[in-house]
Structures are given as C-alpha cells and as structure tokens.
Amino acid sequence: MDKHRTAVAAGHICLDITPVFYGGRGTQMDKILEPGKLIDVGAADIHTGGAVANTGLAMQKLGIDTKLMGKIGDDALGKTILSILESHHAAEGMIVDADATTSYSIVLAIPGIDRMFLHHPGANHTFSYDDLDFAEIAKVDLFHFGYPPIMRNMYVNNGKELVRIFQKVHKSGVLTSLDLAAIDPSSEAAQQNWEEILRQVLPYVDFFVPSIEELCMMIAPETYAKWLERANGSDVTGILSLSDILPLAEKLRSMGARNFLIKCGAPGLYYDMANAEVQQELEEKSGLSCRYQSYAYKRTES
C-alpha cells in the first residue's frame, strides 16, 4: 500500500469577491461600467483565492495531508479567510500579521467579456523566507509555491528571496513545484527581469506549471506582443498552435527547467518531461515507482 502523502502549499493567498452580473449585458465594457451609473448585480460570491488556498485545499480534497503557509492581516477580510480555512481544518500554518492588510480581489465576470481583476496584494508583498517553517517543510513529500509575480519580496533584488527558498527546500530532498500569475503591465513586477529570475530558480524546481500567456510575457515579450496583435482582442490561446509553444518549451529547457506543464487554455496542456536521470532522482525523492514515468518519457522522445 502506498504511504500517506503530505504537502505544503505556500505563497499567495487572498479573498476573492465576485459580484454576479446578470446575463445579456453585451460585450462593450465602457457601456456597462459608466461613471455615475448604478448597476444592479446579484449576491457576491466570496471565497478564498491564490495558490495557497486553491492548490492547497484541492490537494487536501484529493486525500493529501496539506499544510497551508500564507500571510494575512488581522482584519475583517483576514478573519473571513481564516473562517473558510478552519472549515476545512486547514488554518494551522497561516501567519496573521497585525501590521499588514489582507489581500483581496474584486473579480468582474461580466457575461460576454473576459474576466477582469482588481487586486490588492496586501500581506503577500511582505511574505518572505523567514515566514516559512522549513522544519515542517522538510517532513513533507511536496512543496508547492505560487504566484511570485504578485509577491514583492519574491521578485525584487532579481528574485533573490525566491531562489533562496527553492534552494533550501530542494536541498532538503522535498519535491518542489512552482506556479506563476499574470502581471499587470503597469506594475513594478512588470519591470523585473523575469527571464533572469526564472533562469536562477528553475534548476531547483521539479515541476514548473505556468500558463502560456504568463510564460511568454516573461521570457519572450516581443513574441507575446505579436500574439496579442494576431488575437485582435480575442482570447490569445485561441490563436496558438504547437509551433508557437515549442520555441518557449525549448527555451525553458535551456534555462534549466526540469519537468514543466504549460497551461494553454481551451486548446489543452503541453507537458515536457525531464530526462531519465532527473526522473530517477525524483523517484528516489518521492518513493514513487517510475514505471509510468519511463513509459511517458519514451513517448515524449518518439
């Protein structure tokens, strides 16, 4: 019988507040959100968001004993997050910082229009290496970290803090995974050298799981601009083919990426598996059989 699996989900957490817009609104945002206009909406959907809650609670529901490590403020929104996590018996590892505010997002999901997010990073911006309990992390099978692009300490100084975290966890023998988030083009995060940040951290990441748009914006911004032009206002993933994705996959491999899964929206997923030597290392770390991994690797090479 397989042993009971354990994990830590760390990084970004927030409260998502989504007002429900009634159908038939049309497709022009400026005709809906007009200055001085009162818009009748339905009840707000309020739930936790961010990698810590989304991935952490999902793993827990899949039967993995998961500890959450995120930071919130000592305020009404923070108390709401704790209440939700407590209902899942998952609040134990959370940090409450009286000097910080809780992160939240207002999600505008208007029928016929792509979603928009108003996001306040709050306590996520102050999350640091020292907030992690590495003694607890060393005991688990998997360490998952999410959304460094909206966590200031993770991207300033050329990503030094993020690299430091992954070096520490990787050295402890725990499997590691990293997820990204979209970047506001006008934000401080957009001014960072993300290609260099990823080049430094990826050798310590066993599983890298970015979206195709996040990835292209970070390591091939000129290509991303061309994609936007081709899409002409529609969903970028709808105009992509395998020939668009392969150059990014090759670049990731040259940057030291091991296993990576690129999320490509409705068209599907692109998975690139590391070589047999790396897979053997992961087997030794995790105790999982590599029979399926070896088969998948041969399929990738063929």
Label each region the model flagged:
Residues M1-G11, V20-F21, V163, Q167-K168, ...:
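Conserved phosphate-binding/catalytic region of the ribokinase-like
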Residues M1-M69, A76-S87, G112, G287-S302:
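Glycine-rich phosphate/adenosyl-contacting loop at the front of the ribokinase-like
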Residues S83-A100:
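A glycine-rich helix N-cap at a beta->alpha junction
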Residues N157-R164, A190-R199:
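Charged helix-capping and loop-helix junction motifs
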Residues S172-A181:
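Short beta-strand/loop segments at the ligand-binding rim of alpha/beta enzyme cores
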